[in-house]
Amino acid sequence: MGMRSAARMPKLTRRSRILIMIALGVIVLLLAGPRLIDAYVDWLWFGELGYRSVFTTMLATRIVVCLVAGVVVGGIVFGGLALAYRTRPVFVPDADNDPVARYRAVVLARLRLVGIGIPAAIGLLAGIVAQSYWARIQLFLHGGDFGVRDPQFGRDLGFYAFELPFYRLMLSYMLVSVFLAFVANLVAHYIFGGIRLSGRTGALSRSARVQLVSLVGVLVLLKAVAYWLDRYELLSHTRGGKPFTGAGYTDINAVLPAKLILMAIALICAAAVFSAIALRDLRIPAIGLVLLLLSSLIVGAGWPLIVEQISVKPNAAQKESEYISRSITATRQAYGLTSDVVTYRNYSGDSPATAQQVAADRATTSNIRLLDPTIVSPAFTQFQQGKNFYYFPDQLSIDRYLDRNGNLRDYVVAARELNPDRLIDNQRDWINRHTVYTHGNGFIASPANTVRGIANDPNQNGGYPEFLVNVVGANGTVVSDGPAPLDQPRIYFGPVISNTSADYAIVGRNGDDREYDYETNIDTKRYTYTGSGGVPLGGWLARSVFAAKFAERNFLFSNVIGSNSKILFNRDPAQRVEAVAPWLTTDSAVYPAIVNKRLVWIVDGYTTLDNYPYSELTSLSSATADSNEVAFNRLVPDKKVSYIRNSVKATVDAYDGTVTLYQQDEKDPVLKAWMQVFPGTVKPKSDIAPELAEHLRYPEDLFKVQRMLLAKYHVNDPVTFFSTSDFWDVPLDPNPTASSYQPPYYIVAKNIAKDDNSASYQLISAMNRFKRDYLAAYISASSDPATYGNLTVLTIPGQVNGPKLANNAITTDPAVSQDLGVIGRDNQNRIRWGNLLTLPVARGGLLYVEPVYASPGASDAASSYPRLIRVAMMYNDKVGYGPTVRDALTGLFGPGAGATATGIAPTEAAVPPSPAANPPPPASGPQPPPVTAAPPVPVGAVTLSPAKVAALQEIQAAIGAARDAQKKGDFAAYGSALQRLDEAITKFNDAG
């Protein structure tokens, strides 16, 4: 018997060691180099924005967490190895057939490498993983109270939001660390002879037994702690088959006691395991572990299953009633749907209305939105693009401004950005791409309630948006013909200009002006960026770093870069906000607005949690999906939340990229915690200027989440909630080309939050009855500064047509389909239905409005820009249809109903040009042919009796005769035609 001699490992030559070190250095450089470059670039970028404290706080937190986790985990594993080695048997039996001997020799030959390298590698891996949880740790350190306690344990919700996730993280790391130490100790004892196996027998040294048993005992103790924490996590747990989130009857009366029992059993088992140290009998801990396993199966799984099947399911509505009430209360609190925010009012939805009542709703009828921002983008591009490299997004935005008469109006708005992907030929050269074509030019707004001219008139090319433009004019001065004055219309930052792989522009004074700005009849004018934004690029260090970052040698050799040069990058507004506020989830919709004569992008930011007790866990991607998101591939990343607040409003200056964060929700505990983590980065709500407040709108994604939850959580009675009989549904988009839910719409209409006739900017949505196509409710979210965030829900008790039924009634009406069939005959024009708006009018009625567009040909090519040709409406079961809002309203309610509707803007016979005071460069490429003139449409109700149809034909003939007489100047014939028209209208009104 003796110690087996260790086999010597072959030694490496000095040359081999040098080559290995060089290879390792190259590998480290390849792995770490890009990260070091990115870190340095981020240091510069955050500093330029004024948010370097965010970068340093995140970096310091990540480094500290990585080091602490690495040292702790690696140290525990090292301890397991070191103990096994230090207590190894002095003499190991020598056996020729010992399979462990060769491994023992290898380990002994490289003892330091194995003993330190393995724990170090494990610690490094653990640290890298742990640093990704930096936010959880910061919330634990800075989180406060919610001021609300959970209904089961009476703990403040801050415990669940900030403390419990941290405790669970620490417990997970301790379990993994001790388990790895156990494995390392076990393997080390086996290699060094503390554990010997021979056939069916084996031997275990005392030190091996003590160490392994101790580690198992610690694991069992940690499992007992896990059972204790499991109790709290039950409150955000979802059991299969439950219609609500949180602990139900089975969880409280079976699972919760089971967790306590299992915790007690785990403590007993831990004592049994530790007893093996003194008793030298491994059967006792083995029995304890088997008992723990069986208990977890019987007590932890079997008993709750029996309670669920025998006691709960036969009486589920009564048994779960208390817990459903908890879920209703918590979900309303977590998603901002409490009674101080949401106001419910009964609304008939089908009350009869007179022409006078409709006309009196001036705030609604004068603001009926005709322009669909998902359809009119090609028209913006055709008439306002100017050059091939300017571009508008496929889906435009809606905002509101005061018109020249001081009336609140909604506008379809867009920034004319530069799209690098549309550069062609020599424009794609590196110098042109990054130093010449650097910015967009112009803010375009179109009143959403009107168009230029009537498409029904064959002598006019009407139906197109009326464009109000802020742009750099032909003489180099800023022309502000838009809805608000703008000092600087050049756009260096935006979602379109940043939508490319090489998102950067090199700007700054270096000799003559280089940047393309605008054209005159004589030459092209250049410009030099003068904004404060941008990272200095003049030094050789900066040039070298950015050359490496973008893999572009021109940074080093191009003479267009001088001492005053700057580089603009990371130009997407939402991404800039997410970078300086990494704790925010941003809304999918970013929109431009003129604020204090500056063009800014407004970004909505959310704080979220995923473990709010009893609050329903919601998938953001599912809740926010609608037909627009699907069509434009703008779905938000999947994220589960059970708490959400629109806590931050952010602005990004379109010229210099300045990011400003404003506190929107002053009560949000999550935001307060982050404001302590990053002090000074979020400005108080009081700093929001009135000019900015006038353009803040209720965020779309939040509204979609809330309407989905209101479909269930408007119910107060838990028994009714359980039966789902009074639930609502988000309606599907009735448009035949849509494939998802109907999106909410921003409109200006009468203020239903105040229940008066003042104009209000709102975000609205209809709600259907559960699995039905009839209306159940109408939801409006106010964006007015005085009532911002108030939700008004009009509950509709009767059987009122929902969006799908209204759309079916409009599109299948014989007169409508016949008229549109003529317009689209032989694929001359492509007919498109716009957004179907639901508008409360009169006192108790709901008016459906759906604009109709046509574009040349049957394709959806970009050149086929659409124009408005008809307006369709439905009120109760009656359909109105005409070239204008006034015509459709008159057809529905009679003469005078459209008196307060906004009239059509004048136009000329030709295609409307860009505003004369501010002509952009002419659009490149040939102009597409105009839409074939639509035939006159019958004005009036289209659900008609034969007598009314005959009367309408007479009306149409009389109108035609009057037009002909007017053109010829035959006043006698004109008077006769008017008399026949009056008689025909009388026949129409008298017809049954």
Curated annotation (Swiss-Prot):
Alphabetical UniProt keywords: Cell membrane, Membrane, Transmembrane, Transmembrane helix
Bias (Pro residues): 912-938
InterPro entries, alphabetized: UPF0182
Region (Disordered): 906-938
Membrane topology field: Multi-pass membrane protein
Gene Ontology cellular component annotations, sorted alphabetically: extracellular region; peptidoglycan-based cell wall; plasma membrane
Compartment(s): Cell membrane
Transmembrane segments: 17-39, 59-81, 113-135, 169-191, 212-229, 255-277, 284-306
Organism domain of life: Bacteria
PANTHER family recorded: UPF0182 PROTEIN SLL1060
Family under the similarity heading: Belongs to the UPF0182 family.
UniProt protein name: UPF0182 protein Rv3193c
Biological source species: Mycobacterium tuberculosis (strain ATCC 25618 / H37Rv)
The organism's taxonomic lineage, starting at the top: Bacteria, Bacillati, Actinomycetota, Actinomycetes, Mycobacteriales
